[in-house]
């Protein structure tokens, strides 16, 4: 499996059977400078969304239309995407699992919100936010936390799924900050590898991973990858 951070909370996963984009906010993403849109979206078969905010839905509609990708999202967000012209949708909700060729995705809790501004400026709720747990046929289990704070039921997520790779928001203000994110990783999980995200994009959130790195410094059992966006990692 190849895993690439595309800036902010966006990731590309390549397996032998699928190319999955998570929260593909590319155009207008300050953290995606230097990311080639065509390369990032090349061959995409699936798009998985954690929640309905614009900096996570991003370019989903355009990518899905161009590539015929299947979009996996909570039921309310999926319905809204259908109204925007997305044809291939696989809706789910918290606790549910969807199955695709070579992988499954389970929707788990996240502490956040999920909405999109309508044309008249009113915020439209789009279901509950989620984290996403990916189980693969031939690769380690991966947990993208979505946007969230720490919560004690993370321990149940670990018990049920035992993820080896964690994608963790650290930017503060709209998610937990780096120190709390490090506590979440150490208290509730046995990750072999963690990748911080949701930082170094909008100026209103943290611009470095320093607080997270400091919090993880003594937790040597876990490899922390805080490389620049666009770096490809193999697992």
UniProtKB/Swiss-Prot annotation:
Keyword Membrane applies: no
Keywords noted in UniProt: Hydrolase
Pfam family, one: Lactamase_B_3
Signal peptide: none
Keyword Magnesium tagged: no
Name of protein: UPF0173 metal-dependent hydrolase Oant_3663
InterPro entries documented for this protein: Metallo-B-lactamas, RibonucZ/Hydroxyglut_hydro, UPF0173, UPF0173_UPF0282_UlaG_hydrolase
Family from the record: Belongs to the UPF0173 family.
UniProt cross-references to PANTHER family, sorted A to Z: UPF0173 METAL-DEPENDENT HYDROLASE MJ1163, UPF0173 METAL-DEPENDENT HYDROLASE MJ1163-RELATED
GO molecular function annotation: hydrolase activity
